């Protein structure tokens, strides 16, 4: 059963894959030291393969067993939030935090815990439920762990916004200010939509499909547009960039 919302999920998958591969080919492949681009590529691919594609699978499933099989695969979306935080900490130059091992435990620890709980129990999600837009996940009768996971995801997103706002106040370069404002706009889209469809609507008992995947996809496109359009690197000739890297490699090899 393919609905309009199922199509939104598969379109998000295609856009994320395209965005991730575009960034890889333009940045990571030739600029070996660019950690920001590498994390962004991983973020895009994780969102595409472990969230958008799986969401399309269970939403468009023809029966309960197919939807159940797809939902059992929906256990790694937590890492999207971790990669998003890691990406924005890199962008905002929080190197003093990222140089500490404890920071990675804080960034990725909760995602690992929720991942392990999700693959071994039904404390986070239960059997699929058929709605007018397709199949969706069921909420446990005792939703404590589920509430903790969604609260963590919301807090992580809001913390990302705080990090960007704090960073923007310290900037003096006009292009960097404009770039950061675009990224702030990009992160606000999934925050506003996600807080409504994932948190407020369920509290008000309003049945509405989750839109965090397409909103985050759109947000990532806007974020990378801001980085790309105001990046000094884009004004350089790629030949010169590659030549510099090749020359450096030759010198280091001793030839």
Regions inferred by a protein language model and the residue ranges of each:
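Juxtamembrane membrane-water interface segments that cap and precede transmembrane helices
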Residues: 129-146
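Interfacial "cap-and-anchor" motif at the non-cytosolic start of specific transmembrane alpha-helices
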Residues: 2, 6, 54, 168, ...
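Hydrophobic membrane-targeting alpha-helices
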Residues: 20-23, 52, 56, 87, ...
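Juxtamembrane membrane-water interface segments of multi-pass membrane proteins
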Residues: 22-33, 91-101, 162-180, 230-240
């Amino acid at each position: 059963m393919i609905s309009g919302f199922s199509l939104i999920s598969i379109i998000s998958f295609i856009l994320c894959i395209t965005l991730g591969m575009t960034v890889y080919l333009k940045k990571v492949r030739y600029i070996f030291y660019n950690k920001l681009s590498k994390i962004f590529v991983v973020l895009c691919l994780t969102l595409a393969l472990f969230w958008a594609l799986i969401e399309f699978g269970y939403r468009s499933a023809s029966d309960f067993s197919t939807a159940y099989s797809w939902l059992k695969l929906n256990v790694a979306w937590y890492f999207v939030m971790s990669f998003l935080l890691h990406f924005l900490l890199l962008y905002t130059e929080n190197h003093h935090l990222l140089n500490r091992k404890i920071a990675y435990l804080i960034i990725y620890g909760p995602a690992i815990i929720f991942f392990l709980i999700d693959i071994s129990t039904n404390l986070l999600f239960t059997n699929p439920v058929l709605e007018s837009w397709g199949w969706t996940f069921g909420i446990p009768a005792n939703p404590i762990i589920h509430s903790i996971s969604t609260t963590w995801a919301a807090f992580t997103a809001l913390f990302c916004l705080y990090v960007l706002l704090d960073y923007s106040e310290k900037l003096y370069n006009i292009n960097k200010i404009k770039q950061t404002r675009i990224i702030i706009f990009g992160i606000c889209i999934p925050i506003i939509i996600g807080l409504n469809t994932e948190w407020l609507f369920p509290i008000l008992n309003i049945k509405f499909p989750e839109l965090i995947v397409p909103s985050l996809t759109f947000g990532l496109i806007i974020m990378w547009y801001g980085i790309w359009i105001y990046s000094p690197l884009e004004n350089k000739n790629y030949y010169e960039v590659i030549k510099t890297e090749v020359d450096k490699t030759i010198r280091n090899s001793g030839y």
